[in-house]
Amino acid sequence: MSALDEVAKLSQLTNITPDTIFSVLRDRFYAGLPYTALSDSILVSVNPYASSGNRNSDDTLREYTSDYRQTNKQLRAATLPPHIFAHACNAYFYMRRTGQDQSLLMAGDTSSGKSEVRRLALRALIDLSVAPPGKKGSKLGVQIPSAEYILEALGNSRTLENSNASRFGKYTELQFSDSGKLVGAKTLDYYLEKNRVVSAASSERNFHIFHYMVAGASDEEKQYLGIHDAASFRYLGQASRNMDTQDAAKFDRLKLAFKNVGFSKRNVASICQVLAAILHLGNIEFHYDRQRTQDSATIRNPEVLDKVAEYLGISSKSLEEALTYKTKMIRNEVCTILLDADGASDHRDDLAKSLYSLLFAWVNESLNEKLCRDDFDTFIGLLDLPGFQNLSKGNSLDQFCVNFACENLHRFMLRSVFEKRRDEFADEGISHLSPEVPYFDNAETLRLMTNQPGGLIHIMDDQARRMPKKTDQTMIEAFGKRWGNHPSFKVGPADRSGFSSFTISHYNSAVTYTSENLLEKNSEVVSTDFVSLLRGNPQESGKLRNDSSQSSGSTIPFIRGIFNTKVLKTQSHPKNDQTIVAAQQSVKPMRAPSTRRPNRGNTIKRTNTIKKADDDDSDEDAADAADASTSKKNAVRCVAGDFRGALDLLLETLEDTKTWFTLCLRPNDNQLPNQFEARVVKQQITTLGLSEMSRKLLNEYSVSMTYEEFCQRYADVPSLQAVQMRDAVSGEAKQKFSAARQVMSWSDQEAVSGRVKVFLSHTAFRELEDELRAADAEEVKNNEKRAQLDADAAARGESDPFSPVAVLADDYTRSRSNDFVGAYGDPFKERSSVALPLVGRGAAGNEDDLEEVKSQYSGMSGTLARHSFVGGLSGAPSFVASEAYAPSRNMFADMGKNGLNEKAGTAAFTEEPLGEVAEEVGVSSTRRKWVALTWAITFWIPSFILSRFRSLKRPDIRMAWREKLAINLIIWFICACAVFVIVVLGNLICPKQHVYSPTEFASHKGDSSFTAIRGEVFDLSNLVASHKTIVPVVPANSILAYAGEDATPIFPVQVNALCNGVDGNVSPWVQLSNENSTDKHAQYHDFRSYHIDDARPDWYYESMWLLRSNYRVGFMGYTTDGIRDILSEGRAVAIYRGDIYDVSDYIKQGNQGVLRAPDGFQAPANTNRKFMSDAIISLIAQNPGKDITKQLDNLPLDPVVLDRQRVCLRNLYFIGKVDHRNSPQCRFAQYILLALSLFMVAILGFKFLAALQFGRARKPEDHDKFVICQVPCYTEGEESMRKTINSLAALKYDDKRKLLFIICDGMIVGSGNDRPTPRIVLDILGADPNLEPEALSFLSLGEGSKQHNMAKIYSGLYEHHGHVVPYIVVVKCGKPSERSRPGNRGKRDSQLVLMRFLNKVHFGLPMNPMELEIYHQIKNVIGVNPSFYEYILQVDADTEVEAMSLNRFISAFIRDKKVIGLCGETALSNAKASIITMLQVYEYYISHYLAKAFESLFGSVTCLPGCFSMFRIRTPDTHRPLFIASQIVEDYAENRVDTLHTKNLLHLGEDRYLTTLVLKHFGKYKTIFVRDCKAWTVAPDDWKVLLSQRRRWINSTVHNLVELIFTPGLCGFCLFSMRFIVFIDLLSTIIAPVTVCYIVYLIVLVATANGTVPLTAIIMLAAIYGCQAVIFLLNRKFEMIGWMIVYIIGIPIWSLFLPLYSFWHMDDFSWGNTRVVMGEKGQKVVLHEEGTFDPSEIPLQTWTDYENELWERNSARSIGSIIEAARAENKSLGSRAGSQYAPSLYGQPMLPHNASFGHSPSPSYGGTPSQFGAFAPGPGSQIGGSQIGAGAGYFPQDAARQSTYSIGGGYGGQAMSMYGLPPSSSFGVPTGGSGFMPQPFNTTASMYGYPQQVAATQSIYGGSQLGFGGGFATAEQQQQQQQQQQAAGLSGSGGSKSPPREAVAGGLPSDSQIKLDIRSLIAESDLTTITKKQLRAKLEQKYATSIESKKAFINSEIENVLSES
């Protein structure tokens, strides 16, 4: 035995120091001995970073298992060196011999080899305990290692420190029967590092399985999964470029492992498909495209989105919405957060992490379902946690939790070694054998982290639960405040990212953690969008889905299954159980560790004892109980707290086991073999406390028992038979032990005697137990069988198939896969499907197979088992043999075209989506005609080609695309027509002529000198230069002398060179005439033949060719008058083909030429002087000045002769062309364009005159009309909305007569906002943040069930700069089941909320609950009857209104009763924000002062902007409804918006369409522009936003034009009505691109030097902009001239690019889920996924009926409370006719007593009397301000059911309003002639619904200045008053109808009250239909008694009221 082997244990070293331990470890390391024993229960392992030779081989394992089986002491004398195999064998030995559960714990730094040591220990235990081949449980020998390999592939990755680092904590329990046979296994996972899925560090890898799959999948599988190129996946990072060469082989091994544990092929394919979906998910890119959506990001690569959606079994649209929107529960309301590109990327990563972590949990639970047993006896647990982490880039929650686990484990080990048996040893009196050793105790560090309350984890969790009030910074402050003085804690400065940090001194080292997003990570939740999208909402059997939000989930059952696991905790909406509002994946394992009942301590199991049934082990799922309690207390489960709880439970379990520690060391930091660095190893020796533990465990006793137990157990041991120990008790037993100790020669180190117990070391215990084992015949037999099996395996040379050093050649894994199953054979081989068990069964076909049932160690429910583990994706049980597969086989081979989808794959999303609803709608004839025209225009584009484009899959979208193309073609045709008219038509009618009249020609002298030669005009100015070059002797002046002159005489011609005569031959001596030129320069150009000294016959022709090519500018032109003048001179001229010929000389010479021979020569006598045909000459002579074209062409001449004669005419006699420029057709062509131009300029001129207003804005008088200021809000910022609300509050108008009506369109958190928009609005208004009114139903716009919407109503008073204005806030929150953008239906729907309400108020129509509550709030809380309001001021949430605007608007209405709507000037508040806004300043200005001012002259402003306009609700005289007329409301509320036209009208330009409807239905009324009213709005400052805005504006303009065309009176008289002008104006929008092109043409024309300047066009353009400049000057808007210049520069953008872009993107909007197809008979079938809408879901009731019911009940409760009461009443009594609302699913309140809209649970709001004569809320309320006084009649017990804002009463009759007046007599309707004086309070309900006393002092508003006298009532007074009221029948609680409160003894109210009621009824009635009889009937019904005695009085009063109105 070597010296190294003699070192038995470190604890036995003579000098135990870190240095000596280091020396021993180093020497053994270099000797190839990585294992060293510290004591019997602690093993030290040094990671060799290389194969350990045969130290971990199967042969070595057999040596140690053989040693375990060996019971002969002599044969075991050669002790084997320490090894993990021996460690595992010892644990198994103790479990078998003591019956006590064991645990093997691996501790150490990362990269110290813990995972491999754990695998080896597991392997040894399996080898010791697995059943022999062919026996039940034999396949566990393959299945458990396979399961371990699967989890390793899913949970391990390559890091910088370790190539196979565990990224989760793994605790595995091997389960054994009482005979020690392995029967099952259970693995618990602790804290998977799921962030690695999306953000692995540089040079590190993602989880192994991704790389295995990408490298090892077959080509077919890669094709199916789309994973060809690993480097293309963002989630694989740079590490994908350095793929492990063994990854491919490991993937085959992984598939084999899945097969071994019983996973079906579909299961494995599904897992790979999810992994592929995650990889592709990481490649989805986002960009901030604000053209499509207002604030959210869009997908940049939709093809990747489609692929991911297909793999996940969902639609692409649903996935896109889930990625770009985020649903969050804020204050009990589901809100949607619009994500920008960064937010969407983070959300995408969250989905990837959630998918992977849930997949991991599902796989682990599946393995547990297949392997875990319930009926086991003992277990051995193996724990491996990730190593300690301290990152350089910053540590966060992941590192905190991992280090906390390491800290906890280290503390557990220290407690086990140093403290666990301290008290026991002291009690037994053997403390001297276990000396106290000082050691570094980390208990304080652990207390710092876990103290309850106040520990770091507790603080972290508490702060996370209170977000957003608490932040990372407040958490750090809390840390410092609580632990600032702790030695292990320090708050550090801000890190590099600017976030605070804190440092914890761990046992290993100090680690600094950043606080960045720590709270957010600690409260990490799974997005409910993803859960709802992929899991779906379970539906009750047999019920149809009628709600769009109830998603059916993924079509792939596997995807639904992983989201249905127990690990995912969900929270449902309080009002809808099927709506998930919160989901979290617990970091706790799905199962709990196995625990024992009490009495399972360190007692020894008796031999040969049979356990009774009541002594069976049991498991307790303590985690479930903890989870249940936690979920009740806190909705947010925090990661750190959950993890701590899981660890505590685990350590509690380990506390009950016998623990075996393996301390793993890392020899160096570089993962290099054969390197043992002193610094690294010594640091770990010190950290782990090896020297201290070695000294402590000098004497280690493994087993203790009483003396009686010792004697009883070992009485039959052969070595101790002489001692005779049987039946020894008490003192005798102690003596017997002493004797036995002497017999066995044990020292104190091996066995020691205590006070009542015996303590044995491992050596002594093994020695005694071996003798017992040797005497056990059954164990001897089993050991012999096992030894034979080992021998057979050794002979076959089998190896560990899952060893990291195993052979991984592809041919090996693919061809010899059966060898991997080990000595136990393939458990699935030669098994028929009949004999095979279901997937997940434990045994394989034996008759005595144990049935696997759910383990009670697991908390998994049966539901989960049924949902998740019933055999693959099909949902049916799967047999292994039927779906088993070879690793090399394509796992997707049999999936078919639909893949893993449950239904028809992705076709399900394009053809028949689940839950789709079909509705048939009619098609108008106009629509049919337009569709026919569209097809006629676009027939040449086949539909099958369009359908190949991703965005044109649906037929209705393709049809819209065709419509867009058709419209574009029509627009382009109109533009082409405009071009034709401008450019082509003139030339077509009058072709352009390049001719000059003699006058024009003569004028060309000087710089532009022209000259003429034989009718052709040349540019003499340019000719001079070239002539000077050729003939320099001739001065330029001599040449320029011919400017404007005919130069023909100086260019003599040679006749025979230019004319071939009649017969083709002309004598050279023949000349044109005998005339000699008198010009001296002619001689220089005379080269005729008779100049024999220099004859050049062709010189003239050549010169003319040169001149024509370079200098000709035209021809001489002669008009008819000019030709007549020539004829008057006796010249013979004629016109041929537009050319004028003069043959006068030829005729004068006798129809022939003249002869001229050279000097000294005579011409031949027979020379023929004729060269022209006599017939032609005769024709000219006979037709002087006429056109002889036809006659000449018809002459009987040979064609050759005729051609010669034409040439002769052209060369010799041409004098010019006929000038047609003044002909009628040319005049027409000229003046038609001028007329059109003048017409357009005239319109501009009228606009100019309209804009000329010299009057000064005067201050209007104060008016008393009631006005509603409507403000729709969507996602605007807080600052914008605050400015708008403040500007409306500050309007110089009576505050009591204006109402802020704010509609919040959905619970949406806009980009850049930290709260949902409704919360921002309410915070601005100062509403009570604790106020939670119930949501009430109303009818909304939307498809299907989305028409049922819900809203909350808030009301109060808003105070700003001395103004106190009442407000109503309508918060559209949607039904509880809505997830995406709850409540959001668009701006049009927000406008309709008020329009529909006012329409129903006017006509007294039944109202829905929301409208009734609005009515109540306005009438009974604010104190104004809704029918009093006459005007609606519409203002956008980003607009500020000038203070005097409202008064001026109303003045305009009052001046002209025909005005139905008007607008003011809207300027820019951000004019200089960017170049984009600068371009818009001038355009905004002229759109008002030119366009709208001009239209206003005709009373037809065609576009009243929604941002700043005002409408008249009804006519002032006849009370006819105008803006709220039913026809306008019905048209504007069009719900079917499914065509291109309606989309552009109602989705892109709703404001303009509203104006169109007003003009359409009320053509005789006016819409005007009021220049004195001004507002400021925010213009787009980004190019993309501007592009989107103008696209919507331009397209809506075009489509509104189509609507206006059919407006009656459009044509008017002679097409000169205003609407024709509007048509021309709108038409100019279409041809705007042509206008720009024309302007560019003009500019080019002007810039061209030789171009003629179009003076008229330039003058008109100058006039256009000059007039505008005049307007600016007159209005002193000097800066506008500069803005005009900026605008002119941007004309190409406004008039060219934007229109063209807009026209082509006319169909660029969201189409939603609605599809339109054609039915069988041609009808239109609308398909959508929004479910069906049942109108009966929304109850309706008239206000009168509702108010009567309230009278009957004498209740001031809100609508919600009444509905709740009705529901309860209906349940008990059944429904009854005429009752209040029927029960509504969405109308019920959360709590029965919680009244709507401001009901306070306590009387905290009644304490201070307000200035309005009632009780004002406390500090910070929305009412504010108070006066001195006290109130009477204050009853606290009733305060809970009163409205917080019901200042002055509720429903109880004439309730006091906010201003202290009875609502029906408020503001303008005097009560009994007393004006604003209040009525006696004995007939008016108080604030809380009780009669009030007469006020002592009247307030300015009619209430009590000093409150309601009398002070607060005492308890006795309250009781007395209540009794009196009950006696009078006023409480309403008795159930019977009680008389109205104002009733007097005689049964009828007072006359004054009757007058008030008459006025109220008349105000609510339609005067065109109401009669006196009907009014009396209403009064009689109201008073519930006969009114005959008052009939005359009532009739008289009715007439008085009508006469007043």
Curated annotation (Swiss-Prot):
- Major subcellular location class: membrane
Q: Please give the residue ranges the record annotates as the region Actin-binding.
A: 647-669
Reactions accelerated catalytically:
[(1->4)-N-acetyl-beta-D-glucosaminyl](n) + UDP-N-acetyl-alpha-D-glucosamine = [(1->4)-N-acetyl-beta-D-glucosaminyl](n+1) + UDP + H(+)
Compositional bias of kind Low complexity? 1917-1930
Q: Which InterPro entries match?
A: Chitin_synth, Cyt_B5-like_heme/steroid-bd, Cyt_B5-like_heme/steroid_sf, DEK_C, Kinesin_motor_dom_sf, Myosin_head_motor_dom-like, MYSc_Myo17, Nucleotide-diphossugar_trans
CDD domains for this protein: MYSc_Myo17
The record's section on Pfam families has: Chitin_synth_2 (PF03142), Cyt-b5 (PF00173), DEK_C (PF08766), Myosin_head (PF00063)
Q: Which UniProt keywords apply?
A: Actin-binding, ATP-binding, Cell membrane, Cell wall biogenesis/degradation, Cytoplasmic vesicle, Glycoprotein, Glycosyltransferase, Membrane, Motor protein, Myosin, Nucleotide-binding, Repeat, Transferase, Transmembrane, Transmembrane helix, Virulence
- SMART domains assigned to the protein according to its UniProt record, in alphabetical order: Cyt-b5, MYSc
The top EC class, named as a word, is: transferase
Q: What induces it?
A: Expression is slightly lower in the yeast form than in the mycelium and shows a maximal expression in the log phase at about 14-18 h of incubation. Shows a late increase in transcription at the stationary phase in both yeast and mycelial cells. Highly expressed during the stage of white tumors of plant infection.
> What membrane topology was assigned to this protein in its record?
Multi-pass membrane protein
Q: Where in the cell is it found?
A: Cell membrane; Cytoplasmic vesicle membrane; Cell tip
- One Gene Ontology cellular component annotation? cell septum
| EC number(s) stated in the UniProt entry for this protein | 2.4.1.16
Provide the glycosylation site positions: 164, 364, 390, 546, 1076, 1650, 1770, 1794, 1882
What residues does the DEK-C domain cover?
Answer: 1948-2003
Chain intervals with Acidic residues compositional bias: 615-624
Q: Name one GO biological process term.
A: fungal-type cell wall organization
**Which residues of the sequence carry a binding annotation for ATP?**
108-115
What's the protein name?
Answer: Chitin synthase 8
Q: Where does this protein come from, organism-wise? A: Mycosarcoma maydis
